């Protein structure tokens, strides 16, 4: 079992503190949902874990299996088994989907251990079929001209191909219709097992109808203020964040 620990994490952007002491433990074999209103620091948390240089960690630790990874670059964290599926994936012309994924899969392997072209194609075909993706997607430039739904499927395809220890899934349900949501959820559920853990960031309970979390954490004002099991997401759907905030004595303004 691998463990990702976030201890008293404070993160700022351009001098403004966004995370104000986050404590969280993620384990392989578990799926945790991070829920909360917009602007409470959910995406900042995933970016900080992955090492985005635009986010300054001013206090705290991020430990992967007991080792502090704060001084590691993004690519080094990825090679240790961290994966981030972004809400708005970048378009990268000049490199195809297939080229990108094979390079990523082989990045941390010795020459004798690199995946062969045959094995790569076999695995790629299998995972693309699972997600209902056309074969031509493999030869298109990375995310270039992709629709929002295609980009989200492509992020999950990368997840299935790379098989990381921990996936940070940042609002992968954003902008998806119900059919695309089911496909994306199917891909995430395919990964579930003792060697895989996920942190799913979402604003709504809808995604969790298809990916049942083991744990649910509620973020408000840069902190995790409440934790529970999947029933907590259902409670949020009924009461809203205002109801939770009132119960906890937290000041909360409804979004306009």
UniProtKB/Swiss-Prot annotation:
Alphabetized UniProt keyword annotations: ATP-binding, Cell membrane, Membrane, Nucleotide-binding, Transport
One cellular component (GO) term of this entry: plasma membrane
Keyword Lipid metabolism carried by entry: no
Any Pfam family matching the protein: ABC_tran
Amino-acid positions noted as binding ATP in the UniProt annotation, renumbered to this chain: 36-43
Domain ABC transporter: 4-246
GO molecular function: ATP binding; ATP hydrolysis activity
Compartment(s) of residence: Cell membrane
Presence of the UniProt keyword Electron transport in the record: no
Membrane topology qualifier: Peripheral membrane protein
Main subcellular localisation: membrane
UniProt cross-references to SMART domains, sorted A to Z: AAA
PANTHER family: ABC TRANSPORTER I FAMILY MEMBER 6, CHLOROPLASTIC
NCBIfam families for the chain: sufC
Similarity annotation: Belongs to the ABC transporter superfamily. Ycf16 family.
Protein name: Probable ABC transporter ATP-binding protein spyM18_0273
